[in-house]
Amino acid sequence: MNLKTIIVPLLAIAVQPLKAQTADSVVTLLFAGDIMGHDSQIAAAYNDSTKTYDYTDCFRYIKPYVEKADFALANFEVTLAGPPFKGYPQFSSPDALAVAVKDCGFDALVTSNNHTCDGGRKGVVRTLDVLDSLQIPHTGTFHDSAEFRQKYPLIVDVKGIKLAILNYTYGTNELPTPKGTVVNRIDKHNIINDIAAAKRLNPDLIVACMHWGIEYDTVPSRSQMQMAEMLKKQGVDLIIGSHPHVLQPMEVDTAANQLLVYSLGNFVSAQRTAPRDGAAMVNVRLTKHCSQKPKIEADYLLTYVHYPKVGDKRLFYIVAVADVENGLLKPIQSDNWGRLSQFAKDAREVMSRNTNVPEAK
């Protein structure tokens, strides 16, 4: 979480001074999957004594990995529509979730997904307002078309490497886009135009975060593969997928210098049936030599949502699978790591289909 500058086409927000770029500039990016907000997660975050919500503990064990990256991004798959707070099927989470996500080390969020319109116009607008108030950069949804034109794509300068970030969803569960707002949907013509607009801003790399695919299917669909091929041909360098809520394979095309991640799974949710109870974070290493295009390398880290019962409440902790396997989480070690072990076994089977994206060591 060492983001230096966030820039949009007509707006620049300086976060920290840029370091001088050396002959070989190395930048690390981290992408995480779906941040969900089911009823039991809301209940777990509630403090009966203070009558407030706090999600900080949920992220405490994964925070060191997120903070270590120069830039970290996740899919924010809830609305912040205000009370009454509720989970599936139409999510509205407490603002405290966004506070904890920022505290964990995430530098930006994508907001265009099938739950974007769950809270109607209030949900779309208030989510953006809360993220803005917390100074969390975001993209994919907008207050209006003027804001879309001004702020899309999101341009991020990370230690001298400039990224253009795009975000689209396949749909919004048949809910209409609230009047006046903009929710980016997967449309080939619009995407091609947006990529062309991104190129005019001269980024080092273009990132497309795609909410696509078939839920709970560990194999990419034909439409995912076709869209990925189109994105690559149009010049997108990093394709990061979400929506299936399970892992799907990843690949680095070393010849084309492009990364394709079909689905990262559930970063945090209350979906407890395998293989929805875990995910992966993909770590991307960018090496830029002078004016050359950055070289892309990647690996992945498996994560699991630990769900212990404490008193009459279920708690949620995102943990790195490797930390549990190596005995590094003794304060929360459990007799119930069997489900984690099964998730890890199944996840590694899916990841065995990766190309040039190994498990992090």
Give a label for each model feature.
Residues 1-23:
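Bacterial Sec-dependent N-terminal signal peptides
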Residues 21-361:
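Acidic, metal/ion-coordinating pockets
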